Amino acid sequence: MSQITNEVKNQIKKRRTFAIISHPDAGKTTLTEKFLLYGGAINQAGSVKGKATAKHAVSDWMEIEKERGISVTSSVLQFNYDGYCINILDTPGHQDFSEDTYRTLMAADSAVMVIDASKGVEAQTRKLFKVCTMRHIPIFTFINKMDREAMDTFELLDDIENELGIATCPINWPIGSGKEFKGVYDRASKKVEIFSDTKKGTTQGEVKKVDINDPEIFWLITDDQKLQLEEEIELQDGAGAEFDQELVSKGELSPVFFGSALTNFGVETFLQHFLQMTTSPLPRISDRGPIDPMEEGDFSAFVFKIQANMNKAHRDRIAFMRICSGEFEAGMDVYHMQGGKKVRLSQPQQMMASERKMISKAYGGDIIGVFDPGIFSIGDTLTTAQDKFTYEGIPTFAPEHFARVRQVDTMKRKQFIKGINQIAQEGAIQIFQEYNTGMEEIIVGVVGVLQFDVLKYRLENEYNVEIRLENLPYEYIRWIENEEIDLDKLTGTSDMKKVKDLKGHPLLLFVNEWSIRMTIDRNDGLKLTEFGRS
């Protein structure tokens, strides 16, 4: 292990790398854009810097995202704010694309959980929260849409604690909701923040702060609102959890903030507090033990995402890497652990969704994209360390929907195979071939059915291949853990299907849980698992 320099250590201390998670339509992408607005990365929410119109969300770059108004892939966004270098991983909220979100959370050091004030904790929030708790990363809560009718504040806090099993500590407190929403009260400074009109939230607005005991407060909120605020704060101070930075760092206490991302209420306040409370890059688990970025001087990174055709003109493939330790320099040679050889990382880029910027240096905590000629896979480790190591793999989640896929034009077989393989390598779909049939028959597995639509759209628009999908009755897939199992001799129910994945690993498809149990009973020692590993 080489010694880390003070310069590199100081650069890493500035990094804040976090993911934003939520149920669909809770306002996650809007909050992301407001962070970019306050960080100066965009002039106006909804538009890339220099563009004139607010037509699409900055983080929604794929054509299908713009057409449907949903996020279907994680976006990587970097900007500077108040001395910090911020890497935001904006994740798709739609449940059909949750696997991309799971992988993205592996690259984050903390998470911002966005909750709709009128709905509280929703199904997708629960799923994503579980992944965060598995990694023991800090979780910060932004309760959004306070400018609309909202649940009672105490009910919202109870909902988070009861549904997710995490203690909460409100850092600020809302004054009213819906049409009566006036702003937020900061519990530490005892000041009320009143927000002015900000052109429907597209530009930064002035933040007016007034002490709760200042006579001017009566011009801004009603007597009843002030009385209700004082009563609620007294109750919260007496019965609520106190702020504890250590518990926050362990992911056991979630600081809570209230606001409205659409109108900018509470956004910059949240960003300022969050950057102070959250963590700089954390140690990562490897087969050599934890790799601490504050001690490890060698460069190391892992691939958490692969994206083809981000620029249709270039027809390229970008591997997104989370730098875990050390300093990255353009053109450096690193050892690719899974490939078993050295590779040169040339033309490194940092992203603003699909916009690219060539870089010469990056540090632990940063997310970079490098050109991938087809050698990288999700979960791969790269390092310059002499004492080589491999970071823990990224789980592959079991698909729940399956279809046989064929190209309409048999003359386009080559484009079809290339396209479906590239999309599978991104992790957007999983492809399987029936045992002993080769690539003639391809079965696609997805976590959510909307991914079939995305597959069809992308093959047609990016590879000029039209496909037909034949839905299959299978609902369960299991990886075979025993390497010694002979697939030819394995017996199961009549509706079980034997398949192999891209790496040649044997798997079994089942129509129901009874079929799984029967197959295990008929094959002594057979071990099946729901999760593969990259």
Task: Describe the predicted segments one by one.
Residues 1-534:
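Structural and coupling elements of P-loop NTPases
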